Amino acid sequence: FVSSHVHQRASNAGLFTPPQPYDSWVAYGQSKLALIHSAFEIQRRFASDNVQGFALHPGSIYTNIASKGLANKPWLLALRNFFAPLEKMVLLTPQQGAQTSILCASQPGLRGGQYFERCAPGICSTELNDTATAARLWQQTETWVHSLQTEPLSSQSASTSRQASAHV
């Protein structure tokens, strides 16, 4: 799971009780904490089946995502564009940022259930020591996913096939 070092600012309590008022940076940190919990829970549940869970922070990467988010704020976009040459000098390229994901996916003998930063084991929040929270998050996620399924998957596939052939 691609996470972020921003998970360090999040709390387990916030995983189940959203902050009021809503703050996108707090929500971002909470989502990254949840991703790491999920990776570690996958490791606990499926290691005996040779499935490994990894979480990682790829590093700070120069991409155009900030520019797209600032499209409706011209003065902030101009400021971002002004600082872009400096950002390009200090931030990783997308190719460099991908290296930690590649390492976790392909390194023989790498032990799952770890958090990596820039191709090395990283230090994660002590909140991640709480395995009961990880199990609760797993259960809550299963509940949410099952609530989205309104009919059996085999029925959905047949229905989708009928709809697709009707449009041909």
Tell what function each PLM region has.
Residues F1-N72, H146-T160, A166-H167:
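Rossmann-fold NAD(P)H-dependent dehydrogenase/reductase core
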Residues H7-Q8, Q96-Q99, W144:
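Short linear elements at protein peripheries
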Residues L15-Y22, W75-F83, C119-G122:
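Short glycine/proline- and charge-enriched loop/turn segments
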Residues A39-Q43, I102, W138, E142:
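Non-transmembrane alpha-helical segments in soluble domains
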Residues L110-V168:
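C-terminal helix-and-tail extensions that cap enzymatic domains
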